[in-house]
């Protein structure tokens, strides 16, 4: 087995003495830093490489801190208007994952870079920490490589804002297997429309 396989096994056993100590120390370290900062190198090189990261020019790692918990509706003094069914303020759950929120914040901060993917690096009772892989699409090492040319296309501008990253697709219910059967046909809306449209085919 290679070194990355051993690292993968270590990260899978998060309750082991080694990982509990490491995660505790790292969470303390991340709390002292700003909510969004550049990391000198990936904390999990095995995971980063699986998601497409390469240790060469053009790739950047940003670490993002996201506050845990639900999303309170931003209304003044709880004044919501309309029917009582829409009066909720406190127990509202956000439609997307905290990981996709972290990607969005990194993408906003680094507008000239493209978000490739992200991964979890730690959490405590208040925060979750993610590392986001960003790509400089104007770097020659990215533009001239056939494997990475796809992300330089204009259609991938701010892909994290439109649910095109891995975390974003998961929140949209897109994927393979029986867990994702509600989005057969492209999206939840497309699947619903197809199931609820009456088609009377002409008898021939």
UniProtKB/Swiss-Prot annotation:
Listed SMART domains: Ribosomal_L15e (SM01384)
Cited Pfam families: Ribosomal_L15e (PF00827)
GO cellular component terms listed in the entry, alphabetical order: cytosolic large ribosomal subunit
Keyword Ribosomal protein (UniProt): yes
Keywords: Cytoplasm, Ribonucleoprotein, Ribosomal protein
GO biological process: cytoplasmic translation
Subcellular location: Cytoplasm
Major place of residence: cytoplasm
InterPro entries xrefs: Rbsml_eL15_core_dom_sf, Ribosomal_eL15, Ribosomal_eL15_CS, Ribosomal_uL23/eL15/eS24_sf
Superkingdom: Eukaryota
Keyword Ribonucleoprotein: yes
Function: Component of the large ribosomal subunit. The ribosome is a large ribonucleoprotein complex responsible for the synthesis of proteins in the cell.
Record-stated family: Belongs to the eukaryotic ribosomal protein eL15 family.
Subunit (UniProt): Component of the large ribosomal subunit.
Name of the protein this chain belongs to: Large ribosomal subunit protein eL15
Organism: Tachysurus fulvidraco
Source taxonomy: Eukaryota, Metazoa, Chordata, Craniata, Vertebrata
